[in-house]
Amino acid sequence: FANQHLCGSHLVEALYLVCGERGFFYTPKAGIVEQCCASVCSLYQLENYCN
């Protein structure tokens, strides 16, 4: 998993993949769009959004 731009449905799919059964919380205030769509994010950064 390389650092990459993840936007919209791609971002949601990546969260499902990374978080699995733990699930995740998606709140725009958390800055995930800025971190992963406007910029690039890593697997480690995505894990911060898992429950």
UniProtKB/Swiss-Prot annotation:
Q: Which UniProt keywords apply?
A: Carbohydrate metabolism, Disulfide bond, Glucose metabolism, Hormone, Secreted
Q: Which GO terms describe its cellular component?
A: extracellular space
Which PROSITE patterns does the UniProt entry name for this protein?
Answer: INSULIN
A GO biological process of this protein is: glucose metabolic process
Known partners and oligomeric status = Heterodimer of a B chain and an A chain linked by two disulfide bonds.
Described by its record, this protein's role is as follows:
Insulin decreases blood glucose concentration. It increases cell permeability to monosaccharides, amino acids and fatty acids. It accelerates glycolysis, the pentose phosphate cycle, and glycogen synthesis in liver.
Annotated family: Belongs to the insulin family.
Check the record and name the PANTHER family matching this protein.
Answer: INSULIN (PTHR11454:SF9), INSULIN/INSULIN GROWTH FACTOR (PTHR11454)
Protein name listed in UniProt? Insulin
Tell me the organism. Answer: Camelus dromedarius
Q: What is the lineage of its organism?
A: Eukaryota, Metazoa, Chordata, Craniata, Vertebrata
Instruction: Write the gene name.
Output: INS
